[in-house]
């Protein structure tokens, strides 16, 4: 009996130490997760959307250039980018398949717009992961997958344009006025349209104005040290550049 018990103890100890390296090896596999990143961003077909008074709607397209589907949520905000605007986008939520393009429609929900000048809103498109987008673990290697989903929210300008406005961007650019105010220069917009300015150059200086635009009948004050001659890069409705020297 003594010999039998001694044999059993030795056998148990032998199998215990044989198992330890295996357990340690499995632990190392679990401690090294696979990191998978997915970016839920979309390509928008324009930099701004123009809604003309009395039109039933306007539209724009979006494209999913990723290799996986993306859920899309849309919302229109007022100029403050927080309160809801009198527009809806249809469909407000949709699934865009991989490498697919679709068109969204913007519809007004009110007619209480300023009839004398343009109004600015923000059209925001957010890409989010589908609810069932869960990666399964590799059970054979006992490997843990760490999925990181990067959600993006792209906002572009939505401009309401009354019927009374018929000036082209070139005509608006010709109407801008420059006035010196102390040691700085003020750019005045005497029109009822928004003026989108991508860049300003003066001598060796190059800079932008706050928000990138001048509102109707508004102005932008340039920093001190700017020369009397400046060059503006103005964007039209399609995002094309118009260069003007003043």
UniProtKB/Swiss-Prot annotation:
One term under GO cellular component: outer membrane-bounded periplasmic space
Similarity comment text for this entry: Belongs to the periplasmic pilus chaperone family.
Name of the molecule in the record: Chaperone protein SefB
Signal peptide span: 1-24
Broad class of the protein's primary localization: periplasm
GO biological process: cell wall organization; chaperone-mediated protein folding
Lineage of source species: Bacteria, Pseudomonadati, Pseudomonadota, Gammaproteobacteria, Enterobacterales
One Pfam family per UniProt: PapD_N
Key words, A-Z: Chaperone, Disulfide bond, Fimbrium biogenesis, Immunoglobulin domain, Periplasm, Signal
InterPro entries: Ig-like_fold, PapD-like_sf, Periplasmic_pilus_chap, Pili_assmbl_chap_C_dom_sf, Pili_assmbl_chaperone_bac, Pili_assmbl_chaperone_CS, Pili_assmbl_chaperone_N
